[in-house]
Amino acid sequence: MALDHPDTVRILAFLDEIGIPVSRGRIEGESFLPGIEVRSGGLVLDPARPFHPGDLLHEAGHIAVTDPADRPTLCEVRDDPGEEMAAIAWSYAAARAAGIDTRTLFHADGYLGGGEALAAAFDRGAGPGPP
């Protein structure tokens, strides 16, 4: 997606408003989510790479659910199912607050092919269930 896409603009404004920094910069090598990396408690968005706007909210969710004392040094998302669930729940709440469609957040290319199932579960008010 482009930086000027309406969803991207809305998400970037929301993250700025709540104090999660997003900078534009080059990402060397592969990142877990295309074009986005957690670095020093903020997000780096590589405008030269394709990315999904909803992934910005998901990665911001990892920052948001991290202990505030640990955020400034956060550079890697832990492989923790509980943290992943918390980041998913936070990103859904953030999408609602920012006026972002559930299917922009839980897109078809993400969540190991389970984006539609997550979107449907949250739209029903159920959420994904326990880890």
What are these regions (language model features)?
Residues M1-R39, R49-P50, A97:
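Auxiliary, metal-adjacent structural segments of Zn-dependent hydrolase domains
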